[in-house]
Amino acid sequence: MSTNKDKIEQSLALLEEVRKDTGQNPIHNYQYREIMHREVLKQYLPTIERSVGGHGADAVTSTLKNIELKSSTWDRKSDPTIDTWKPIMFDMSKLKDSTKIYDYQALGHGLWTRTGAYPIANFFIGPNHIKKLHPLFKKLVDEYDTNTGRQDTTFTIKDILNYMDKQDIIWFKNGQRVRGV
């Protein structure tokens, strides 16, 4: 019978193989989610790859240099819907952090179960539509309070849909492109 120590060592050995393949430690700050998010997005963005460095863009393509990929944990048994989709969180603890959202050329968000490699659902807003979110970003930045410490701000897919049509968003379910959630 395997002990917890044995299971962890086996897991860490496999995770080290992923680190060697991707250049990212998959368990640091949920990096495995970025790795798998990029893998799913290759259906739509064949040249997507990891951006170099731990700050700034999460991914790049041959034409996009600032793709932001966000993730959340999905603990429900049911599939996510527009109404139940988890909020997207941004750290706005520094003013420069709060304004860098205007520089995003694309935005993705995925929902992961605690044991799933692929997101059970994710979406991607590309360069033709991301600027439609600037009024939402302005609202978030205007609410920024420089006197507090770490300040997270969230918005939902319903908030996004106040600024763009559902068909402006690329949707995926269990790693496959779909028409919507």
Residue spans of the language-model regions?
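Nucleic-acid endonuclease domains
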Residues: 1-181
